[in-house]
């Protein structure tokens, strides 16, 4: 089937994508890249989805196989201490603690000054990615971009 789009964004979880992707092939839709959110970043996507998700690209909040040195250092240290692969929660907690410790080491000794110091952070290279804080106090993080190679999720950035 000839379609007039190059990509299809499906904002759902991996469990739904492995049901949707084969339908594209069944209806002879080809040449369409599947785009997804962090809910796709699960080993079952490639195990169950197989060839139907081979061109998929998704955003992820954390990827333990990232090529960024600051992520690899965290993953190695976590593995040494806990004999496990960290998840997004471990990476986020590590980053939160480090952001506070950096402020304390810089001499910020009150709640307000620590908060002000964190608000000024730009481009912090953390385990959960590069983080900057906006004027309104919200964090802006660059997501990890993942693709599918064989039966593995691989870093695209």
Where are these regions (language model features)?
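Extracytosolic ligand-binding ectodomains
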Residues: 1-157
């Amino acid at each position: 089937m000839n379609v007039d789009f190059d990509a299809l964004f499906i904002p759902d979880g991996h469990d739904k994508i492995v049901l949707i992707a084969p339908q594209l092939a069944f209806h002879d839709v080809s040449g369409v890249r599947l785009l997804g959110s962090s809910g796709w970043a699960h080993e079952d996507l490639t195990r169950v989805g197989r060839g139907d998700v081979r061109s998929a690209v998704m955003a992820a909040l954390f990827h333990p196989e990232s090529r960024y040195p600051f992520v690899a250092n965290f993953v190695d240290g976590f593995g040494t201490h806990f004999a496990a692969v960290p998840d997004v929660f471990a990476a986020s907690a590590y980053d939160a603690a480090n952001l506070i410790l950096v402020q304390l080491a810089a001499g910020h000794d009150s709640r307000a000054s620590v908060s002000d110091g964190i608000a000024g952070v730009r481009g912090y290279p953390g385990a959960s990615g590069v983080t900057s804080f906006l004027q309104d106090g919200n964090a802006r993080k660059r997501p990890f971009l993942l693709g599918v190679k064989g039966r593995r999720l691989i870093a695209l950035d």
